[in-house]
Amino acid sequence: MSRPQRISVLGATGSIGLSTLDVVQRHPDRYEAFALTGFSRLAELEALCLRHRPVYAVVPEQAAAIALQGSLAAAGIRTRVLFGEQALCEVASAPEVDMVMAAIVGAAGLPSTLAAVEAGKRVLLANKEALVMSGALFMQAVKRSGAVLLPIDSEHNAIFQSLPRNYADGLERVGVRRILLTASGGPFRETPLEQLASVTPEQACAHPNWSMGRKISVDSASMMNKGLELIEACWLFDAQPSQVEVVIHPQSVIHSMVDYVDGSVIAQLGNPDMRTPISYAMAWPERIDSGVSPLDMFAVGRLDFQRPDEQRFPCLRLASQAAETGGSAPAMLNAANEVAVAAFLERHIRFSDIAVIIEDVLNREAVTAVESLDQVLAADRRARSVAGQWLTRHAG
């Protein structure tokens, strides 16, 4: 019998990381943790190291590494604790690693995700921002290295499952008319427009269907999450923005669909649980038990669909425009959104200001070509600076 596959989980203490480790624990004969990384929840990271006994753990700073190393050593755990961004890249690209779960939220996850790609790993991509920011640069690295890139977002995973194996030959060539990207509409789908300016971070984070981290919950509430996913879908499946249509589906049972020229629409359905796409990507092309309960169609009862309202969700419009513009526009969109969401979560701005900040950044900053990681990160820094200037002028 072959040895278990070794996985580095980047962002192990987040919701995606924890779901990944749940699947690992269900299949100890197939998978083992090689490296676990965490940013701020270091007590949780310690508990995960005690349970999974990885070869490495990675934390942001040296002081935290020394403290965690001491705690683990006292418990008889031989995990070696590293720190810093270079260590993240090292555990993502180590020769011993078979697959990498890229689940660090936001731009911070780009260097380590790209390191895994350049090392030719099986990359389970949960960090959509990495692909949104670097686009062609990222996909060229995938082709050059021979990495296997498998999407973890439930929507892109559903699209991947609904497309023919030869979709890389071109969507039109394999008979695809369009991709239907589903969205729940979030917690404010029916909130009166005049009330959106006064909603709280707690309300924005109360997603009706999914259990997610705070940043992605706010992105779902604004539908920026869907805008980022539209950009991601274009890169993953070599689609034009006009070939991707966003459909609001409040039940989150259909995770996305593919519309074919013969009139067929193929969809992937399931309970809203991230262990389904995670286990699919880990085992692909096989399927394994994920721990997710079977879908009860009788309990679902009905499936509803709506067009998104751009007045209610201006972030979706801004993301679509950035997708059409290309170049550094998606990286700047993402950076401005990260700054704005952080300010909203800290109660410095209103929910409705998120789109205002993003639009201000996109209007002020010139779009440039991005042909290197340095250029991507430079665009990210410029956008964050302009967003910060807006906060200085307007935030309470």
Curated annotation (Swiss-Prot):
Q: Which cofactor does it need?
A: Mg(2+); Mn(2+)
Q: Which GO terms describe its biological process?
A: isopentenyl diphosphate biosynthetic process, methylerythritol 4-phosphate pathway involved in terpenoid biosynthetic process
What SUPFAM superfamilies does UniProt report for this protein, alphabetically?
1-deoxy-D-xylulose-5-phosphate reductoisomerase, C-terminal domain, Glyceraldehyde-3-phosphate dehydrogenase-like, C-terminal domain, NAD(P)-binding Rossmann-fold domains
Pathway(s) this gene product operates in, as recorded in its UniProt entry: Isoprenoid biosynthesis; isopentenyl diphosphate biosynthesis via DXP pathway; isopentenyl diphosphate from 1-deoxy-D-xylulose 5-phosphate: step 1/6
User: Which of this chain's residues are annotated to bind 1-deoxy-D-xylulose 5-phosphate?
Assistant: 128, 154-155, 184, 207, 220, 225-226, 229
The source's superkingdom equals Bacteria
Q: Reaction catalysed by this chain?
A: 2-C-methyl-D-erythritol 4-phosphate + NADP(+) = 1-deoxy-D-xylulose 5-phosphate + NADPH + H(+)
Q: What class of enzyme is it?
A: oxidoreductase
Q: Where does Mn(2+) bind?
A: 153, 155, 229
Q: Locate the residues binding NADPH.
A: 13-16, 127, 129, 213
Q: Summarize the activity regulation.
A: Inhibited by fosmidomycin and 3-(N-acetyl-N-hydroxyamino)-propylphosphonic acid (FR-900098).
Query: Looking at the keywords, is DNA-binding present?
Result: no
A GO molecular-function annotation: 1-deoxy-D-xylulose-5-phosphate reductoisomerase activity
In the Enzyme Commission scheme, what number(s) does this protein have?
Answer: 1.1.1.267
What keyword terms does UniProt attach to this protein? Isoprene biosynthesis, Manganese, Metal-binding, NADP, Oxidoreductase
Family, according to the entry, reads as follows: Belongs to the DXR family.
Summarize the protein's role.
Catalyzes the NADPH-dependent rearrangement and reduction of 1-deoxy-D-xylulose-5-phosphate (DXP) to 2-C-methyl-D-erythritol 4-phosphate (MEP).
The name on file for this protein is: 1-deoxy-D-xylulose 5-phosphate reductoisomerase
Species annotation: Pseudomonas aeruginosa (strain ATCC 15692 / DSM 22644 / CIP 104116 / JCM 14847 / LMG 12228 / 1C / PRS 101 / PAO1)
What is the gene called? dxr
